[in-house]
């Protein structure tokens, strides 16, 4: 069995993935750690404080593990995983997510790009394109780890979640775009 837990940074993937793997007695794999430990990246982006992954190498190495294991895979790149029985996309209210990421001390550009990705449903869309009806979206806003885990185990999906129906979120997106645009010369 392969379960992918995905979503933008700050939505609760790590804790939920680890708890889910324990509850189902499956191995846990953080794809980010896997990439770093196996040097499956091409460079480090100083501005975003992130590694640029080598997608082909990641897919190749991941395939070796998937073919012989039962896993919960935590990732922001669901389409790099070739197969899954369930794909859980964790979502979070953009205002709450913004505060979470700012609290981590991340650069403004990194916060803005990740919150924008959440608002636009970038990871959700990627998951749906790759895995169609195997996708379950869960809104983690103001939920405990136990509540999130119960929703996943009971396949109580909230999605698809559309943040842009809220005019406050639309205005927030415009503000995020201004932040991102201010870095255009650095990108």
Curated annotation (Swiss-Prot):
Q: List the disulfide bonds.
A: none
Q: Which GO terms describe its molecular function?
A: adenylate kinase activity; ATP binding; ATP hydrolysis activity
Highest taxon listed in the record's lineage: Archaea
Q: Which UniProt keywords apply?
A: ATP-binding, Kinase, Nucleotide-binding, Ribosome biogenesis, rRNA processing, Transferase
Q: Where is this region: NMP?
A: 30-53
Does the record carry ATP-binding as a key word? yes
What assembly does the database describe for this protein? Interacts with uS11. Not a structural component of 40S pre-ribosomes, but transiently interacts with them by binding to uS11.
Q: Where is this region: LID?
A: 103-113
Tell me its family: Belongs to the adenylate kinase family. AK6 subfamily.
Q: What is this protein called?
A: Putative adenylate kinase
Described by its record, this protein's role is as follows: Broad-specificity nucleoside monophosphate (NMP) kinase that catalyzes the reversible transfer of the terminal phosphate group between nucleoside triphosphates and monophosphates. Also has ATPase activity. Involved in the late maturation steps of the 30S ribosomal particles, specifically 16S rRNA maturation. While NMP activity is not required for ribosome maturation, ATPase activity is. Associates transiently with small ribosomal subunit protein uS11. ATP hydrolysis breaks the interaction with uS11.
Catalysed reaction per UniProt?
Answer: AMP + ATP = 2 ADP; ATP + H2O = ADP + phosphate + H(+)
Listed EC numbers:
2.7.4.3
Q: Which residues bind ATP?
A: 10, 12-15, 104
Question: What PANTHER family does this protein map onto?
Answer: ADENYLATE KINASE ISOENZYME 6, POS9-ACTIVATING FACTOR FAP7-RELATED
- Bilayer-crossing residues are none
Q: Does the keyword Transmembrane apply?
A: no
Q: Which organism is it from?
A: Saccharolobus solfataricus (strain ATCC 35092 / DSM 1617 / JCM 11322 / P2) (Sulfolobus solfataricus)
Query: Which BP terms does GO give this entry?
Result: ribosomal small subunit biogenesis; rRNA processing
Q: What class of enzyme is it?
A: transferase
